[in-house]
Amino acid sequence: VLRTDGKENLMTSIEIAAAQDKEGKALVPEVCIFFENHLMRGNRTTKMNAENFNAFRSFNYPVLAEAGIHIKYNQAQIHVNKSKQELVPHYLLDTNIVVLKLFPGIQENVVATMLGTKGLKAVVLETYGSGNAPRKEWFIRRLCQASAQGIVIVNVTQCNAGMVEMERYETGYQLLQAGVVSGY
């Protein structure tokens, strides 16, 4: 027997997408995920479970709406674009990006290979905790070299909740000095 919450999620998603304010503008004018009675900002949401109905979480941002008998909108958290300009979608995105997830014992040849990728423009560096990384000389040197070549390196935490604070610990500060930028 297939058990699904898809019908309820779809119906409520359509209701929210169609909701308008007094001026006839979308009540929630942003990309969202609606799941298990919660509306979450799309770029702040992570799928945490492949089997449970409560599969998505927004760790560092509150829900935008909660559905029950009525839909309760969290207006203070919903982004309203005050610009008069129309949306101009960008279809040609640069995909010369790698995600470098750090792990204990990572070897120089692994880091060198990833940072040496032909045409590389950016690296998402997944660090420990609040932005910590290996303190090995070769690691910092490789990051400095990549940064000097114009490769943007963004430091993000591997943790589901919390953020990078590069000036909190010495290892994070070394990354900052190597040209790595905080991804928060």
Predicted segments with their positions:
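Internal gly/pro-rich beta-alpha loop/helix module
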Residues: 1-68
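Accessory alpha-helical/coil subdomains and C-terminal extensions
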Residues: 41-130, 135-136
